A protein has these predicted regions:
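Amphipathic/hydrophobic helical signal segments and adjacent flexible N-terminal regions
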Residues: 1-80, 86, 90, 163-164, ...
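Exposed beta-sheet edge/beta-hairpin loop segments within beta-rich domains
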Residues: 30-32, 155-161, 165-173
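Short hydrophobic/aromatic-rich beta-strand segments that constitute the beta-sheet cores
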Residues: 41, 83-85, 112-116, 138-141, ...
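Transmembrane beta-barrel outer-membrane domains
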Residues: 56, 94, 158-160
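Well-ordered beta-strand positions in beta-sheet-rich domains
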Residues: 62, 98-102, 125-127, 166, ...
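Hydrophobic/aromatic-rich structural module bridging two neighboring secondary-structure elements via a short loop
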Residues: 70-114
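A short, structured loop/turn motif at beta-sheet edges
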Residues: 73-74, 105-110, 128-137, 169-177, ...
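An exposed acidic His-Trp-rich patch
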Residues: 100, 107-157
């Protein structure tokens, strides 16, 4: 998780933005560098909840991660990727899962942020730490956490409430990357928590487009 800073650990000057930083996002993504581009994964596996119990489902994924211009919050500076993941079952056209959001890295303190929004009425912001050279990292979110939390529509909270979210990303030497994701759910009338697990390995099919400022 992101380290919680006390008020006296934040800078007193909350308005002055950093100066002289590079505007080339692709050169400053740190641990996210190996994820930039357009990717395809054909061997995804999903373990999802059904009335009869857990069910395994294979899936095919296309995910596009494009660099954005550097973002500042006063003195805070992020480099990041905007992404769109589109998932279908093998040999089908119908959408199985769709997800948009951002991957962000803060070089000053190695903070990582992963935001995700899905069209079931759910959003999550997961957080973690990674140094620029790290090839594996984890991010986490938890229900009720104001820094790295989860918000769902009323029906999902009633029937399939997400209480935790975890993702581990691995950047591989062969140019691929993979993830293992665990969405921990409290399902109505079930005592034990359910681990909705997803995993896939992504192969690059197209390079990323430089961010707008870097193209000037």
């Amino acid at each position: 998780m992101l380290k919680r800073l006390s008020m006296n650990e934040f800078p007193q000057d909350i308005f002055t933005e950093p100066q002289g930083y590079s505007v080339n996002t692709l050169e400053n993504l740190g641990p996210l560098t190996g994820m930039a581009g357009i990717w395809e994964g054909i061997r995804g596996m999903d373990v999802k909840p059904k009335a009869q119990g857990p069910k395994q489902q294979a899936y095919v994924e296309r995910i596009e991660l494009q660099p954005i211009d550097p973002q500042t919050n006063g003195p805070q500076l992020f480099y990041g990727l905007r992404y769109h993941a589109h998932i279908t079952k093998p040999d089908q056209v119908k959408m199985y899962h769709d997800q948009v959001g951002y991957w962000l890295w803060e070089p000053a303190n190695d903070n990582l942020i992963h935001t995700l929004t899905i069209p079931r009425g759910m959003i999550t912001m997961a957080a973690g730490k990674a140094k620029a050279s790290d090839k594996q990292f984890e991010l986490h979110a938890k229900e009720g956490d104001c820094d790295a939390g989860i918000s769902s529509n009323p029906f999902l909270n009633y029937a399939f409430r997400t209480v935790e979210f975890h993702i581990q990303v691995s950047i591989h030497d062969d140019g691929t990357w993979s993830y293992e994701q665990d969405t921990v759910m409290k399902i109505k009338c079930q005592e034990a928590l359910f681990h909705h697990v997803d995993s896939n390995t992504l192969h690059k099919i197209e390079e990323a487009t430089p961010n707008p400022q870097a193209r000037l």
